[in-house]
C-alpha cells in the first residue's frame, strides 16, 4: 500500500511552520491515545498514531523535510521512525515523552529522544547591536566586532573537574541525562534534576571555570555589512551563539543594525530627503545651486519664483536597498532663507522693492490673490 503524503497525514500545508507541525501532531497524538481508544478501535488508533508519528519525525527534522519536499517518500528511509510492526504501543511512550518533554522545561533546543542517551541541546542564540553611519549602510563595509565567547578551560581541559579528580556518572539517571516519570498512561521524559542533563556529577569542580569546563573570553569576528542595509535589519552569523550542551550545535549570533542620525539626509526606505537652503534672491530670480548626495555633489536649476517647500527630485540618487534592483531617489526640499543683520542701505533697498511690489498687486505673489480673497471672506 502506498503511503499517504506526510503533510496530509498531519493536516497541514506544505509551507507550515515547525510550531504548526508540532501542534498538529500533538492534537493527533491526544486523539489516538490508547486511553481514549479501547476495544475494536484500539488497532486502528495504533495505526493512525504510527502514521502521525512517522510524519512528525520526518517533517520536524529540517534535513529530512527538505529531502522529502524534493524527492517525496523516495528521499527518506521508508523504515525510519515506524520501527516495524513489533513496536506496538511502545511508540506511545517515546512519542509522548518527546511531546510532553517540550511542555515540561525541555525547550525547543532539545535534540534526541527517550532511550537515546544524554540529552543534546542546541545553544542559545545571541544578539549584538551594531551602529553604523548612513554612508556605511548605503555602500556596505567590512567590520570587526568583539563578542563574548566560551572556550575550553585550560586548567581542567574541558572536563570541569579539579585537576587530579574526575567526573562521576550520575546515579539518579545512570548517565542518561534524563529521567522517565510515569503518569498513568503517560511516560514523560524530563532533564535529570541532579546532573541537569549532563549525565555526570563533578564532586570537586575546577576552580578556574567553576566546573563548567569552559571560560568566557572575547572573540573577534569579521562581519560583512551588505550595501543598502536598513535600520533594524539583522545579519546572522551561524554557529557564533552560545555553545550547545552534550555535543549539541552552537546557537547563532544575530547582529542588529542601528543607523546613526545623519546631519543632512533622512532615509525613507530607498529614498533620501534633505532640506536645501536657498537665498530669497535666488528663489526669486532663479539660478543653479549645488546639493549634496551620498556619491558627491549634484546641480539643481532653481526656476524663477521658487517658493519655500518646493520639492526637487533627483532620480537614482537615493540608496539601492539590499532587496532592490535599482536605487531610490533624493528629494530636495527648498528652504528660503530670510537675510538677517542688514545694513541701513540694504534695508532701504528692500523697502523700495516692497513698494514696487505693492504697486504691482497680487500678481507678484502666487498665493497673494487667494489669501486676499480669504481675508475678505473672513471679515465679511
Curated annotation (Swiss-Prot):
Residues 371-380 have a biased composition (Basic and acidic residues). Keywords: Chaperone, Cytoplasm, DNA replication, Metal-binding, Repeat, Stress response, Zinc, Zinc-finger. GO terms for molecular function: ATP binding; heat shock protein binding; unfolded protein binding; zinc ion binding. Its main location: cytoplasm. It comes from the Bacteria. One of its GO terms (biological process) is protein refolding. CXXCXGXG motif repeats lie at residues 153-160, 170-177, 192-199, 206-213. Residues 359-380 are annotated as: Disordered. InterPro entries: DnaJ, DnaJ_C, DnaJ_domain, DnaJ_domain_CS, HSP40/DnaJ_pept-bd, HSP_DnaJ_Cys-rich_dom, HSP_DnaJ_Cys-rich_dom_sf, J_dom_sf. A zinc finger (CR-type) spans 140-218. Signal peptide: none annotated. The keyword Iron does not apply. Zn(2+) 2 binds at residues 170, 173, 192, 195. Its cofactor is Zn(2+). It is found in: Cytoplasm. The keyword Cytoplasm applies. The J domain is necessary and sufficient to stimulate DnaK ATPase activity. Zinc center 1 plays an important role in the autonomous, DnaK-independent chaperone activity of DnaJ. Zinc center 2 is essential for interaction with DnaK and for DnaJ activity. Participates actively in the response to hyperosmotic and heat shock by preventing the aggregation of stress-denatured proteins and by disaggregating proteins, also in an autonomous, DnaK-independent fashion. Unfolded proteins bind initially to DnaJ; upon interaction with the DnaJ-bound protein, DnaK hydrolyzes its bound ATP, resulting in the formation of a stable complex. GrpE releases ADP from DnaK; ATP binding to DnaK triggers the release of the substrate protein, thus completing the reaction cycle. PANTHER family: CHAPERONE PROTEIN DNAJ (PTHR43096:SF48), DNAJ HOMOLOG 1, MITOCHONDRIAL-RELATED (PTHR43096). Homodimer. This is Chaperone protein DnaJ. It comes from Delftia acidovorans (strain DSM 14801 / SPH-1). The lineage of its organism: Bacteria, Pseudomonadati, Pseudomonadota, Betaproteobacteria, Burkholderiales. The gene is dnaJ.
